[in-house]
Amino acid sequence: MLMHSILILLVIIITTYFTRIWPFMVFNSKNPPNDFVRYLGRALSCSVIGMLVVYCFKDIHVLKPPYGINEITAFLSVILLHRIFKVFVLSITLPTILYMVLVQSHALEKAFFNIHVS
């Protein structure tokens, strides 16, 4: 059983490694990407962000507490941080951490709606 788990982990590690390194092997300085691939790189980044926003807000129930306050707080922190610093990694990482803390601690529910979660 342990050997089976180790083999599964190795396959996952190797597969992940090759999917990450593959673009660098295919598109190097000798073989730059064509215009279509460059276009996809620009267009898909915006599409992925849009998809993540929809995914973030899909389970909000606006008619019952906590009314999506955790999601809205994290979303507003993304906008604020990106307007101030204009650093994508910071704009994504800190609000993600904020959202996780808010969801797991139920801090906003306790503060604004007097909801006590055990």
UniProtKB/Swiss-Prot annotation:
The chain crosses the membrane at residues 6-26, 43-63, 84-104. Keywords: Cell membrane, Membrane, Transmembrane, Transmembrane helix, Transport. It is a multi-pass membrane protein. It holds the Pfam family AzlD. It is found in: Cell membrane. GO terms for cellular component: plasma membrane. InterPro entries: Brnchd-chn_aa_trnsp_AzlD (IPR008407). Belongs to the AzlD/HI_1737/HP1330 family. This is Uncharacterized protein jhp_1250. The lineage of its organism: Bacteria, Pseudomonadati, Campylobacterota, Epsilonproteobacteria, Campylobacterales.
